[in-house]
Amino acid sequence: MSMELTVLGPLAGRSFAIAGKPKLLLLRPTNLPLLRLSLPLSLPNFSSSSRFNSPIVFAAQESNLSVSNENETSEWLMQDFYTLRKDVEIASARVEEIRASANLQQLEQEITNLESKATDTSFWDDRTKAQETLSSLNDLKDRMRLLSEFKTMVEDAETIVKLTEEMDSTDVSLLEEAMGIIKELNKSLDKFELTQLLSGPYDKEGAVVYITAGAGGTDAQDWADMLLRMYMRWGEKQRYKTKVVEMSNGEEAGIKSATLEIEGRYAYGYISGEKGTHRIVRQSPFNSKGLRQTSFSGVEVMPLLPEEAVGIEIPEEDLDISFTRAGGKGGQNVNKVETAVRITHIPTGVAVRCTEERSQLANKTRALIRLKAKLMVIAEEQRATEIKEIRGDAVKAEWGQQIRNYVFHPYKLVKDVRTGHETSDITSVMDGDLDPFIKAYLKHKYTLAMASAVTN
C-alpha cells in the first residue's frame, strides 16, 4: 500500500510518501513533547481502506519516511522563527502607533496636575469631587503603566529575535518564550484598543445583569439559566468577581429570573451591549418527542454604582413599593418574613427586586440604589436632563429588542442581529467566549456615534 499523507500542526502543509504500514510515523521533531495516539486511528480525508492499526507516535525512532530528522527540525524551527519575526514586527508597529496616539507628554502632565490637586489642603472639602479626581488619576496611571508594559514586552521579544539571528543554532526555549510574549502582548493590545471605544459616564464601573425568562415555558426558564452561566463564565475569564445576588427558581427546571453582580474595571462598558432579548432554537429536552422549540429570555444591564455615586432624588409619589416573602431554600427568614422588596418607578414602569439582604430595610435601600442606577443610565441614553423626562414607551421598546439568535438545531450558529457577527462554535459562546461579539458591538456602536456626529 502506498499513499500520500498531508501533515497538520507544526509541520502544516508537508506531504510525506508512505509505503506499507509504518510502525512509527514522524509528525514532530524529537526535541519537542511526545504525544501517543490511541489506536486504531482513521486518518481524515482517507478512504476506509487507509486505516492504521500500527502504533503511531509523535517521535522519530523507527520510520519509513524518507526525511532527515535533523534537517526537518532545523527547517521547522526556522519557519517558526520567520513567523515569529514577522509577528514581532507587527506587534512593534502596533505598540508604536498606540503610544504615539496616546500623547505621553500630555498624559504625564495631566498626572502631575491631578497629583498636585490631591495634595491641596482643601482637597477633601468636597468628597464627591475628590473621589472623581482620584479615580481619574488612577485611570491615567493605569494607562501610563500599560503603555510602558507594552514597550517592555515588545522590546523583550525583539531582543530574542536579535539573539536568534546571531546564534549558530536556534534555541527552542527562546522561541517559545518570545511566542508567549507576543501572544500575551497581542491580547493586551486588543483589550487596550477596546477600552478606547468606551467613553460613557458609567463604562468604567462594574455591572449588574438582570436575566428574566420570557416566552417558552420551562424551555425559556432553562434558557435563562444557561444565559446566567454564560455571563458568569465570561466574568470569570475576565478575572472579574461574579456573584449571584438574587434568583427565582423555575417550577420544573432553570430559573424565572436572576440578578448577577460583576465587579471589575470596565465590566459595564464591555457587557452593556448584551441588553435585549436573546432567542434560542433547539430540540427541547423537556419534550418527549424532541420537537424543535423557540424560547426567549430578556437581559438588562446596569452599572454597579456605590450609594454615594447615585445622587438623584425620586419623589415618593413616583414609587410603588411592595414587600413579599423571600424565596429560596432553607434559612430562618425564608418564606417567614416579608423581607423581599420590589420597587417600581410608576412614570416609566421600570422595576427592581431585591431579596439578598436579611432585613426589609436593607433590601429597600439596595433596591432603591439599583432603581436609581437604572434611571440614570436610561436618562443618559435618552439624553434626558432629568428623570421626569424619561419616556416609558421608549424604555419598553428598547428592552424588548431582539439582539442575538442561538441556533442549536438543525445547525449550530450564534448570530448578532445588530452587527452581523456570527460563529458556529456555539459551545465556546455558551462557555463565556463573548469577546468577539462584544468587540463587534462596540465597534458598531462607535461607528454609529461617529456617523451621527457628522450628520449633526
From Swiss-Prot:
<dbReference type="GO" id="GO:0006396">
    <property type="term" value="P:RNA processing"/>
</dbReference>
<dbReference type="GO" id="GO:0006415">
    <property type="term" value="P:translational termination"/>
</dbReference>
<dbReference type="InterPro" id="IPR000352">
    <property type="entry name" value="Pep_chain_release_fac_I"/>
</dbReference>
<dbReference type="GO" id="GO:0009657">
    <property type="term" value="P:plastid organization"/>
</dbReference>
<keyword id="KW-0648">Protein biosynthesis</keyword>
<dbReference type="InterPro" id="IPR005139">
    <property type="entry name" value="PCRF"/>
</dbReference>
<dbReference type="Pfam" id="PF03462">
    <property type="entry name" value="PCRF"/>
</dbReference>
<keyword id="KW-0150">Chloroplast</keyword>
<dbReference type="GO" id="GO:0009570">
    <property type="term" value="C:chloroplast stroma"/>
</dbReference>
<comment type="similarity">
    <text>Belongs to the prokaryotic/mitochondrial release factor family.</text>
</comment>
<dbReference type="GO" id="GO:0016149">
    <property type="term" value="F:translation release factor activity, codon specific"/>
</dbReference>
<protein>
    <recommendedName>
        <fullName>Peptide chain release factor PrfB1, chloroplastic</fullName>
    </recommendedName>
</protein>
<dbReference type="InterPro" id="IPR004374">
    <property type="entry name" value="PrfB"/>
</dbReference>
<dbReference type="InterPro" id="IPR045853">
    <property type="entry name" value="Pep_chain_release_fac_I_sf"/>
</dbReference>
<feature type="transit peptide" description="Chloroplast">
    <location>
        <begin position="1"/>
        <end position="58"/>
    </location>
</feature>
<dbReference type="Pfam" id="PF00472">
    <property type="entry name" value="RF-1"/>
</dbReference>
<keyword id="KW-0934">Plastid</keyword>
<comment type="function">
    <text>Directs the termination of translation in response to the peptide chain termination codon UGA. Required for the proper translation, stability and normal processing of UGA-containing polycistronic transcripts in chloroplasts.</text>
</comment>
<dbReference type="GO" id="GO:0009507">
    <property type="term" value="C:chloroplast"/>
</dbReference>
<keyword id="KW-0809">Transit peptide</keyword>
